[in-house]
Amino acid sequence: MDQKNNILLQKVRSYRGVLSAGMQLYISAFRRFFKASWMTALIYALINAALGTLTAIKVPELIVVIQLQLQRFNGIFIESLQSYLVVLVECILLILAAVIAMAVAHGTIYALLKEHSETGDISMPGSWWKPSRSMMGRTLKGELLTLLVSIPLLIVAPFALPLWYVLTKYIMEPSTGYWATLRKGYGRGMGHWGSLFLVYFLTVLFILLSGMIVMLPANILFLANYRAQMGVLIGDPLGMPSYMIPMTFITFVLCSFLYFYVCLPLLINGYYAYGSIEAKKLEHEQQQLNLQ
């Protein structure tokens, strides 16, 4: 069987087959994924870098102020909290912006996966910036609604796993609304919980291990800034060069940009897990017809 047939979407696969097909597509079409998504991935990286730099520099001040007030005065002054309210609001807004930017960037990837599901191939994007607005919007809506639905299920985390299948099904089938997809697809996803668990567990493990390496420079600078700021607040000299803050920001941009592409197997393997479940459903329906 040639490689193109091996990475077709709707084909019954074991969890190993899903991971293998996902990795083949990830490697063979990486240039296409990169060309289609680099702009949105860069926007996400810039927002994430701003968040990382802000938290490394400003959040220690808030923590130390609260700790000192609790120790000395057995209470927290409202005035001190109000003075840092702007920082907290900025962090919250940056987190929301990062989530939205990531969802929009995912939309560019799902647009290519949608093309692959229909044609069995992914064409090279004609330009460096040619986004699919409809797919971006659908992905943003789907990921935000999935996040909303998954919050109550975090108490019983295993029940949240089929939502990944529901999300991919919703994005790949534009004719169906999210809530209708959730009603019809959640039970089917639960029926394949074991294979979904293995696919996502191994994929997340790969991302965690790779991400530790990719994000290591940013994490080192984050901790260095954090400890330096904590030291200043208790009377120590800063001991950091003046270029440390811009260097931290630039490092976060580069690491976040690379980390976005490290995380792509999560989307691609989920895409193939969805295709395998759909293929099994069609196979079961065909068997039922043959028995009649």
Question: Predicted segment positions?
Answer:
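Interfacial loop/helix-cap signal at membrane boundaries in integral membrane proteins
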Residues: 70-87
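Interfacial aromatic "cap" segments that immediately flank transmembrane helices
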Residues: 11-46, 126-151, 163-211, 248
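Hydrophobic transmembrane alpha-helix segments characteristic of membrane transport
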Residues: 104-134
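Polar helix-capping/helix-linker motif
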Residues: 31, 83-84, 245
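Juxtamembrane transition segments at transmembrane-helix termini in multipass membrane proteins
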Residues: 2-12, 21, 58-73, 110-122, ...
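Hydrophobic alpha-helical transmembrane segments in multi-pass membrane proteins
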Residues: 36-59, 86-103, 138-161, 198-227, ...
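Short acidic/polar alpha-helix capping motifs at helix-coil junctions
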Residues: 73-78, 92, 132-133, 235-237
